[in-house]
């Protein structure tokens, strides 16, 4: 079933008017937050076990506590709105349908961690939503929710909107920061970690759109009721985007524990023309794949992990029987070959050579040795690449080897 906690404001107010937002309770969470000790807010987030919704699953309360504890002046909070993962478009819906909530969430984050500046880093392809966020920021300033001495609490904070240039790798934290600084969007070595030295060498706290957008709702609504959704490691609700060969692709808010079957057949309307499922990719291009045997698995962090896939970015791509697994793998690999920034050798060369071997498989000229080399390259990439792009680029391929082993069983004639 679909629920409306994070999405409860969708369609309820005029997204161009702060007054309309305030009529549905807008900025009441901020008013409440500035009367609370910041530690009380992080304690609440820790108590309800909120994890980051960007894919890393890092506990939000712990992240904000660590950011607050870092010494340094002029701290920064960043909203990662560079939603570049393929088949993932849930954050776009939050920006489009609830822009003032995102602004409010960033102000609360700044209050908690002690930041004076914020950046929203928006992917280039979302340029049409830039005026919507700029308007929300401008009106928040006019009403005294941004600027100096916010709500008379001696708290100063401003938000700056920055658009990327279309590079997938800028979804990675350090590459995103270098892009904001006006440099080439390429990852850097860690440490120093960005919580200590991030944008312009200032302590930085980075969260994605969905993670931030949860906070105002948790402060105003009964966090205990929210925490009663889901179980174990997976608390609350999750925004997911479903794409591919389904009848009703779109974004849905589900309670953790909803089965994959319920998502695809009850919410997304089933597979087009009742065709068979060839594969489902979870978490975008860097995610893993499964076949139809996963349908009755609950959508939770732990259950999907046990099934060999992951929540990741919250994207689900459904491919029906008309598309061959090999063609899908080649398309996925082409994406990483094009999007690698080229800075580190394992990712730059590894993606190219995996692409070459997959093309040889399609042409019927691959050998057993080619398959062995491809596996070795994939493992080296996962262990030695500079950033998450190279580390996870082989996830789809390696999971396909487990789900479709016959595809990689090259006959002895070409060995």
Language-model segments: which ranges?
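Histidine-anchored nucleotide/phosphate-binding helix
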Residues: 98-112
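Hydrophobic alpha-helical positions that pack around
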Residues: 130-256, 268
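Short amphipathic, charge-patterned alpha-helical segments
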Residues: 105-109, 256-274
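Gly-rich Lys/Arg/Thr-decorated short loops/hinges at beta-loop-alpha junctions or inter-strand turns
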Residues: 21-26, 79-91, 194-199, 241-246
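Conserved phosphate/anionic-ligand binding catalytic regions in large, soluble enzymes, centered on
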Residues: 47-67, 164-178, 182-184, 337-349, ...
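Cofactor-/ligand-binding subdomain signature composed of acidic, glycine-rich
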Residues: 1-42
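Short acidic, glycine/serine/threonine-rich loops at helix termini
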Residues: 56, 62-64, 88-91, 130-135, ...
């Amino acid at each position: 079933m679909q629920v409306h906690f994070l999405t409860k404001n969708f369609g309820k107010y005029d997204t161009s008017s702060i007054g309309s937002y305030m009529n549905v309770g807008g900025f009441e969470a901020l008013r409440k937050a500035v009367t609370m000790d910041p530690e009380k807010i992080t304690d609440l987030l820790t108590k309800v076990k909120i994890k980051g919704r960007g894919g890393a699953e890092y506990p939000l309360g712990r992240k904000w506590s660590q950011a607050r504890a870092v010494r340094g002046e002029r701290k920064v909070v960043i909203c990662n709105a560079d939603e570049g993962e393929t088949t993932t478009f849930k954050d776009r819906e939050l920006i489009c349908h609830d822009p003032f909530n995102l602004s409010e969430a960033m102000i609360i984050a700044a209050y908690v961690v002690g930041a004076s500046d914020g950046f929203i880093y928006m992917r280039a392809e979302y340029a049409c939503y830039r005026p919507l966020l700029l308007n929300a920021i401008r009106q928040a300033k006019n009403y005294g929710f941004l600027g100096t001495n916010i709500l008379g609490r001696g708290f100063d904070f401003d938000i700056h909107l920055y658009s990327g240039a279309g590079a997938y790798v800028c979804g990675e934290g350090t590459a995103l920061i270098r892009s904001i600084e006006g440099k080439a969007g390429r990852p850097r070595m860690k440490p120093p970690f960005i919580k200590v030295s991030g944008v312009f060498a200032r302590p930085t706290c980075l969260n994605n759109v969905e993670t931030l957008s949860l906070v105002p709702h948790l402060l105003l609504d009964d966090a205990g009721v929210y925490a009663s959704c889901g179980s174990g490691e997976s608390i609350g609700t999750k925004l997911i985007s479903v794409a591919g060969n389904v009848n009703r692709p779109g974004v849905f808010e589900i309670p953790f524990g909803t089965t994959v079957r319920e998502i695809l057949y009850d919410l997304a309307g089933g597979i087009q023309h009742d065709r068979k499922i060839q594969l489902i990719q979870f978490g975008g291009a860097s995610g893993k794949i499964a076949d139809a045997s996963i349908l009755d698995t609950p959508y939770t962090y732990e259950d999907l992990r046990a099934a060999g896939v992951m929540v990741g970015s919250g994207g689900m791509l459904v491919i029906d029987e008309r598309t061959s697994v090999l063609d899908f793998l080649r398309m996925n690999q082409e994406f990483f070959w094009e999007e690698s920034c080229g800075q580190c050798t394992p990712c730059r060369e590894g993606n190219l050579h995996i692409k070459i071997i997959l093309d040889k498989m399609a042409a019927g000229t691959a050998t057993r040795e080619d398959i062995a080399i491809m596996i070795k390259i994939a493992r080296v990439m996962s262990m030695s690449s500079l950033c998450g792009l190279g580390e996870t680029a082989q996830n789809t391929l390696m999971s396909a080897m487990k789900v479709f082993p016959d595809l990689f069983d090259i006959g002895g004639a070409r060995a």
